[in-house]
């Protein structure tokens, strides 16, 4: 969109210049006038062609592969930010389920495997996840410019003014996150959920402010509806502010519609990309719950009673049966079921990055292996998976065709 606007301005300037030139030379030689017209027509044609060429060129740069690690990198939406197609999330694990030593080991494995994206939030472990993440980055001495650090704002504290997406909390909340992370800025700050109590203009203005102040490079949304994202974009364009570049959404074999139907439309219309989380559905797809809920699993924790109920429900049993049917496909491809599930998420080109949540180095190494499975995700394999799942969502375009 920026290119097309620039081209339009260029055309207007060219047209004004053409008028001035023609008025000066109209009484002289007609051949000079014709030459000038031809020149400006050529400039206009080139400018218009750039407007159509640039998006195609952008798409051609969408994915690249690191030679040493094999990690793939994609643009975050239609922004210029390059993110590893696999990122490391810190929900539940950092500051909670795992020790600080294990957290450091996980980050080291991820970084050495080519992962540059690390995601956290002010609410994770009441801010402790940010503290651990920042301490590890400082200890390791990794170049800040080689990292993409993202955090999310909404639930900051118990006071009314310490949560939500008011201008006050966005600015104060991000300052608090930066202090815990020991960083000068984050690459992307996310609104962790919509806030019906705050006007959209106030949210967009606050996000624009923290970016202009150098506290963040970009901003995005998490668990927002397509309509809410479009409203934020419209407000940003109306008042010459900065629109969101990405939506964080849940995406896995059993949760598909938003990422496969709604977000692609937003990507093509306004450039908003998808960063997805929970590729293993909170561990449901890992295979560990095939025979009940193990004592050491996430579903066994008191605060995850909802997950346990989901697993033992009738729908949960149906999902486990489908996973058993998918196992032969994984065996044929020479991978594990979790690797198949992560590679299935990555095969969606509309997904900029998939956030992994691992509690052990072994789990992380296994999930990172999905990169090697990705080339095997042919249309035939994807159709096989769809035939087993029987939950493929269809867009309006699909129905029309």
Swiss-Prot record:
Database matches in Pfam families: Aldo_ket_red
Chief place where the protein resides: cytoplasm
Catalytic residues in the record: 124
Transferase is among the record's keywords: no
Any one biological process term the GO annotation gives: regulation of delayed rectifier potassium channel activity
Binding residues for NADP(+): 90-91, 97, 119, 192, 222-223, 248, 277-282, 288, 298, 357, 359, 363, 366-367
Disruption phenotype: Mutant mice show subtle defects in learning. Such learning impairments are not detectable in older mice and are not observed when mice are kept in a stimulating environment.
Tissue: Detected in brain, in hippocampus and striatum (at protein level). Predominantly expressed in brain. No expression found in heart, skeletal muscle or kidney. In the late embryonic and early neonatal brain, highly expressed in hippocampus, cerebral cortex, caudate putamen, colliculus and cerebellum.
Reaction(s) the record says it catalyses: a primary alcohol + NADP(+) = an aldehyde + NADPH + H(+); a secondary alcohol + NADP(+) = a ketone + NADPH + H(+)
Ranges annotated as spanning the membrane: none
Signal peptide location: none
Record Gene3D superfamilies: NADP-dependent oxidoreductase domain
Keyword field contains Hydrolase: no
Top-level taxon of origin: Eukaryota
Similarity field: Belongs to the shaker potassium channel beta subunit family.
NCBIfam families referenced in this protein's UniProt entry, alphabetically: Kv_beta
Function recorded in the entry: Regulatory subunit of the voltage-gated potassium (Kv) Shaker channels composed of pore-forming and potassium-conducting alpha subunits and of regulatory beta subunits. The beta-1/KCNAB1 cytoplasmic subunit mediates closure of delayed rectifier potassium channels by physically obstructing the pore via its N-terminal domain and increases the speed of channel closure for other family members. Promotes the inactivation of KCNA1, KCNA2, KCNA4, KCNA5 and KCNA6 alpha subunit-containing channels.
Protein name, entry field: Voltage-gated potassium channel subunit beta-1
Taxonomic source organism: Mus musculus
């Amino acid at each position: 969109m920026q290119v097309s606007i620039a081209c339009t301005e260029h055309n207007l300037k060219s047209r004004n210049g053409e008028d001035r030139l023609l008025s000066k030379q109209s009484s002289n030689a007609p051949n000079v006038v014709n030459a000038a017209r031809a020149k400006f027509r050529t400039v206009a044609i080139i400018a218009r062609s750039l407007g159509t060429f640039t998006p195609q060129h952008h798409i051609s740069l969408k994915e690249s592969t690191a030679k040493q690690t094999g990690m793939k990198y994609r643009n975050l939406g239609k922004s210029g930010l390059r993110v590893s197609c696999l990122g490391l999330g810190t929900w539940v694990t950092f500051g909670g389920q795992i020790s600080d030593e294990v957290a450091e080991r996980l980050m080291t494995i991820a970084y050495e495997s080519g992962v540059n994206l690390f995601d956290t939030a002010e609410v994770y472990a009441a801010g402790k996840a940010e503290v651990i993440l920042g301490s590890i980055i400082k200890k390791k001495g990794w170049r800040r410019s080689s990292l993409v650090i993202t955090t999310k704002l909404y639930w900051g504290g118990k006071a009314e003014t310490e949560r939500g997406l008011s201008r006050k909390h966005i600015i104060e909340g991000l300052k608090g996150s930066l202090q815990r992370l020991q960083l000068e800025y984050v690459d992307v700050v996310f609104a962790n959920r919509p806030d019906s109590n705050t006007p959209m203009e106030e949210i967009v203005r606050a996000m624009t402010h923290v970016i202009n102040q150098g506290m963040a490079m970009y901003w995005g949304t998490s668990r927002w509806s397509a309509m809410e994202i479009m409203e934020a974009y419209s407000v940003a364009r109306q008042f010459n502010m900065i629109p969101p570049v990405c939506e964080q959404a849940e995406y896995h074999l059993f949760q598909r519609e938003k990422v496969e139907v709604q977000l692609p439309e937003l990507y093509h219309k306004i450039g908003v990309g998808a960063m997805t989380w929970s590729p293993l559905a909170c561990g449901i797809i890992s295979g560990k719950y095939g025979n009940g809920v193990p004592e050491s699993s996430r579903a066994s924790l008191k605060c995850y009673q909802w997950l346990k109920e989901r697993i033992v429900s009738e729908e949960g049993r149906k999902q486990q049966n489908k996973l058993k049917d998918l196992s032969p496909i994984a065996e044929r491809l020479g991978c594990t079921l979790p690797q198949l599930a992560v590679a299935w998420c990555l095969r969606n080109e509309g997904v900029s990055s998939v956030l992994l949540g691992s509690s052990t180095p072994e789990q992380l190494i296994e999930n990172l292996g999905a990169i090697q499975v990705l080339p095997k995700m042919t249309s035939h394999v994807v159709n096989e998976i769809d035939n087993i799942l029987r939950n493929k969502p269809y867009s309006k375009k699909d129905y029309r065709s």
